[in-house]
Amino acid sequence: MFFKRSITVMLLFFLLGAASPLLAQEAETPSQAQDEIDSILYGEAGVGGVIQRLGKVESDLFGRELPGSISERQLGLLNFIRNGTLGQPSMVFKTGVAEWAVLHEVRSDMPLNRRISEIERQLEGAAGEDRPLAMRLERILSLLITGQVTWQDVRVPANMVFRASFIDRISPKSAAAGDVVRLKMEDHLSIEGYLVAPRGSRIIARVDKVKPPRSFGRPSEISFVFDRLEPLGPEEIPVFLGDAAVLASKSDKTVAAAAGTSALGFILLGPIGLAGGFLVKGDAQEIPPGSVIYLETSALSNVKGYPVPPSLKGLLESSEYNVSEDSEGTETDTNQEGGVQSEQD
């Protein structure tokens, strides 16, 4: 009975989402749209024709293929999986809430099917891979949370400071301008009881410039520009490395201590709004994964947040460095790009 009721409700939201084209941005071609759907769900584009791949996704999610044109079905899937529909949070949002409740962090770099399987293994010892994926997620949520998972509009102010760490290993020898650099949140970001971005939420930066070693023994350099934080919802939060973040780095004893080691240090490069960042020195030839940096939001952002119920409030309070609206930094000029520069001896 639970299975049939859950599938019926999910199919209703799916069909309503397909009729609401403003909730998603369509890709240029059916193949591109399908690649995007496959990547979110499986981590890579599928093989075969679009119709075959589309049918597989629907069967994996709902246990059956759905009616409608290719574009309607793909739009409905993108809304159901990533964007949400008519007040109903997306699968990505719900999965993040479940991960936060069980693991106290999200695993944004894993495909959705693996994320759900890992939660099942944590709770029940095995993944229920013989059942439709959407139903499996709803069952997980019914075990963790009383009532339905909802989301609300939340305003994230500019200049909120938070800790992040590098996921990727960065070396001036191998980096090239334009390379994507991944970081993750080290703490939960919440606004007045609404969970916006749990620990583990992904942050995207890019390599801006790379300079090879120069004359007179001057070291090679690599600089980064920070782009965005990807919260629970489908929106993006712009971030940068500004004065408030640099001040927080200096005030953090752990991070400040790293500045005195041979592995990692901080340098400041200019006035407010310009780059501050890392200096790789001594025997170190790279920025290793796990290197901590403070960043801050660069503009006011409207995003979706999870209204944390009283039974789960302790998960927010248990985070030693939980970020809240009270940690909003001072006003700074965010019209200039903030970045990180690394130098290699």
Task: Give residue spans per PLM region.
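Sec/Tat signal peptide C-region and signal peptidase I cleavage site
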Residues: 20-24
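Alpha-helical, heptad-rich or low-complexity scaffold/stalk segments
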Residues: 25-145
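Bacterial N-terminal signal peptides that target proteins for export
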Residues: 1-10
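Contiguous beta-sheet cores, especially beta-hairpins with glycine/small-residue-rich turns
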Residues: 150-268, 273-345
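Bacterial N-terminal signal peptides
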Residues: 9-18
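A detector of low-complexity, intrinsically disordered, Ser/Thr/Gly/Pro/Ala-rich segments
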Residues: 5-6, 88, 330-332
